[in-house]
């Protein structure tokens, strides 16, 4: 399974892996899995990032429409990816690709 491989290799993950994972399992699940693997609670992540817990929950659930706007969403995702030690640029890129795919369906 992708998650098992990712989980085992998390400490040594390279940017290629984070991009591949974000595209395979989705940005929401990638961020959640990374947070859990680093043993942070959602509350701790929200407190550290200075972002309301409800917004991080929305990101982890893929409910981007509950966020205050596209600019905020990209910044929240970028900061969250940095926080969990993923390549932020690639995670944001995967998010934009997800959104584009949703809009064309």
Regions found by a protein language model. Give the residues of each.
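Recognition helix of helix-turn-helix/homeodomain-like DNA-binding domains
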Residues: 53-70
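Positions that flank functional sites
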Residues: 50, 61, 96
């Amino acid at each position: 399974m992708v998650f098992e491989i990712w989980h085992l290799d998390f400490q040594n993950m390279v940017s290629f892996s984070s991009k591949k994972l974000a595209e395979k399992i989705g940005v929401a699940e990638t961020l959640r899995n990374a947070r859990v693997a680093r043993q942070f609670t959602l509350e701790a992540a929200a407190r550290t990032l200075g972002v309301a817990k409800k917004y991080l929950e929305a990101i982890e659930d893929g409910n981007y429409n509950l966020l205050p706007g596209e600019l905020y969403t990209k910044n929240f995702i970028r900061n969250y990816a940095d926080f969990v030690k993923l390549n932020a640029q690639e995670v944001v890129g995967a998010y934009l690709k997800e959104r584009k795919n949703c809009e064309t369906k």
